């Protein structure tokens, strides 16, 4: 998630970007000085597995699972995507686009580049542009989600700038799959589960989170995170088994919902006055306005987390580390917070460790005083950082943008194209294409 534009202190380390990889086993961090990868195999130690200082002002850095393939965008060249083999320190290829790159999504089949009013679908094996979705509704936040499942390889993005419509696109067969009327307000967050069969959505209002079946678009679950105030949802994330869904926002509370269907018990005739009254009350809900009836049927949080800050943009993930379910929160204050989740009882989650995203660690009982509740909310989009003056015009590239192509690739290193297997996390997909 983009954290550019944070008006911050030295504690944030000039953080511009943070995101978990597809299976939540590593964390990528982009900053003014370059980018880093951290392993998430331990709670006690945040192990730095790689650091690059060759590229400054890294505003997007996405790693393909645990492979060496990484996609990078810099504020100094915001229209240029570089695909690199970070362990070898080599650039595989690059592409230039017609506008600022707002988001990049990866799985083992596709690479998606999101611009404000278009989406480019690349074949990750050779980086050819397979399809371009043009003239999408304005999407200045670069909101989109890509399923990590090879068989259910769907892309979700806003279908409207004024209401919460979700467009679902099949990136394998390159055709529209469905349009889901998810919310009345514009979309704020999207997330697929690992199987690609569920999609979680939240609107700018931020009070209700819904889960739909994919590609059918049937509403499966509806959760209410609150009724007192509207919030800005920063992040939605499923656990890898699809049983839990976390939602973080610009408030201090992270909600975790359990995706379970309550089995209906056979109806029995009430034998007491209270039982009869309860039956009448439930029957009466059918006469209430639909909005009120929905509130009766909405699920509540199974577990919650109280963050030591309020107002920071953040990214959350549900991961199993050392055989224990954890909630991970990477925040614009430059820290990664690790909480334990009780999968049976839920309730308030326990803060186990907090790590600085420079690799150092602080005990759970030493919460920083600087993480106060009156800190301003960070800029919501990468484009906001550009408009604040961070943008520096990029140097001329080998290929200029042309309207016919939309995305133009640079040279590819030939020695990177041999003997590389897509299903090996220690390697990356073979890049065999060269430009037209």
UniProtKB/Swiss-Prot annotation:
SMART domains: WD40 (SM00320). One of its GO terms (biological process) is pexophagy. WD repeats lie at residues 182-222, 228-267, 311-349. It holds the Pfam family PROPPIN. SUPFAM superfamilies: WD40 repeat-like (SSF50978). InterPro entries: PROPPIN, WD40/YVTN_repeat-like_dom_sf, WD40_repeat_dom_sf, WD40_rpt. A motif (L/FRRG motif) lies at residues 223-226. GO terms for molecular function: phosphatidylinositol-3,5-bisphosphate binding; phosphatidylinositol-3-phosphate binding; protein-macromolecule adaptor activity. Its main location: membrane. It is found in: Preautophagosomal structure membrane. It is a peripheral membrane protein. GO terms for cellular component: cytosol; phagophore assembly site membrane. Gene3D superfamilies: YVTN repeat-like/Quinoprotein amine dehydrogenase. Keywords: Autophagy, Lipid-binding, Membrane, Repeat, WD repeat. The L/FRRG motif is required for recruitment to PtdIns3P. Component of the autophagy machinery that controls the major intracellular degradation process by which cytoplasmic materials are packaged into autophagosomes and delivered to lysosomes for degradation. Involved in an early step of the formation of preautophagosomal structures. Belongs to the WD repeat PROPPIN family. This is WD repeat domain phosphoinositide-interacting protein 2. It comes from Gallus gallus. The gene is WIPI2.
């Amino acid at each position: 998630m983009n954290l550019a534009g944070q008006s911050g202190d030295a504690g944030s380390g000039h953080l511009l970007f943070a995101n978990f990889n597809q299976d939540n086993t590593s964390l990528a961090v982009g900053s003014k000085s370059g980018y880093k990868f951290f392993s998430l195999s331990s709670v006690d130690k945040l192990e730095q597995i790689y650091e690059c200082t060759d590229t400054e002002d890294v505003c997007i850095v996405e790693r393909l699972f645990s492979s060496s393939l990484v996609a990078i965008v810099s504020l100094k060249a915001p229209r240029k995507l570089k695909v690199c083999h970070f362990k070898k320190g080599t650039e595989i290829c690059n592409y230039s686009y017609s506008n600022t790159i707002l988001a990049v999504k990866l799985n083992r089949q596709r690479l998606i580049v999101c611009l404000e009013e278009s989406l480019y679908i690349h074949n990750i094996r050779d980086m050819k542009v397979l399809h371009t979705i043009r003239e999408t509704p304005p999407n200045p936040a670069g909101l989109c989600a890509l399923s990590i499942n090879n068989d259910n390889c769907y892309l979700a993005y806003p279908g409207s700038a004024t209401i919460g419509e979700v467009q679902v696109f099949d990136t394998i067969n390159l055709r529209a799959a469905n349009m889901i009327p998810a919310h009345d307000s514009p979309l704020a967050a999207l997330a697929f589960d690992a199987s690609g069969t569920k999609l979680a959505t939240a609107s700018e209002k931020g009070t209700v989170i819904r889960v739909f079946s994919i590609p059918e678009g049937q509403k499966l679950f509806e959760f209410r995170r609150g009724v007192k105030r509207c919030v800005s949802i920063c992040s939605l994330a499923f656990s890898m088994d699809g049983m839990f869904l976390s939602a973080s926002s610009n408030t201090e509370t992270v909600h975790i919902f359990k995706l379970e269907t309550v089995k209906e018990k056979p109806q029995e005739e009430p034998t007491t006055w209270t039982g009869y009254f309860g039956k009448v009350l439930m029957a009466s809900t059918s006469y209430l306005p639909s909005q009120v009836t929905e509130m009766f049927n909405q699920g509540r949080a199974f577990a919650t987390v109280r963050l030591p800050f309020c107002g920071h943009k953040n990214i959350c993930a549900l991961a199993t580390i050392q055989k224990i379910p954890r909630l991970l929160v990477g925040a614009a204050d430059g820290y990664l917070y690790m909480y334990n989740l009780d999968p049976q009882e839920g309730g308030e989650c326990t803060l186990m460790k907090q790590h600085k995203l420079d690799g150092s660690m602080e005990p759970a009982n030493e919460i920083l005083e600087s993480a106060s509740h009156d800190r301003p909310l960070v800029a919501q989009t990468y484009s906001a950082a550009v408009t604040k003056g961070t943008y520096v015009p990029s140097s001329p590239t080998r290929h200029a943008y042309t309207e016919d192509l939309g995305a133009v690739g640079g040279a590819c290193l030939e020695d990177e194209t041999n003997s590389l297997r897509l299903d090996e996390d220690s390697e990356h997909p073979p890049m065999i294409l060269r430009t037209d």
